[in-house]
Amino acid sequence: MASSWTGERVRLRAIEPDDWAAFTHFADDDGRPGSRPALPRSAESYRAWAKEQAVAKGDGDRFRLAVETTARGELVGTVGSHRTGSRSGWFEFDVTIGADHRRKGYATEAVVLLLRFMFAERRYHKCLAVVLAHNEASLALFGRLGFTEEGRLREHVFLAGRHHDLVMMGMLADEFDRRHTISAP
């Protein structure tokens, strides 16, 4: 039986202490639409963060996973659930793929694996994604996955010297099931 954390292109796994070097490259990618300029960090701070993530005890519904390729075992990004409303049955997630690894289907597959777990195993009813309006790649990705724009917070985020709209997108479990099937293939 195949792992529910493994697809054709990617495998989702725990973050390991040795992953710190890859995260320094992802953080240096200021070219991502929507990435906020960050203060420079030391290599030691990335080592400490990766070590902390490796031993973190998630609450079951909020967690971050490494995304690595199945072909080469190369770390290409992260995906995770970071906010939940367990009473109402919703969760919010994020996905980050390093610049050298974009447009290869890694984000698509990582998100499908995450959503399948959250809908099937954790019994959530709705998934939320929040995207800066000028991040066309993420808007297109979520649209292809079946998310629907549910709202827009106008000029809600200040970034790079001006205010930007924030797009709220959602997908219900039954919508996901029709497109991707909740039970793994």
Residue ranges and their predicted role:
Residues 103-117, 136-144:
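Conserved acetyl-CoA-binding loop-helix of GNAT-fold acetyltransferases
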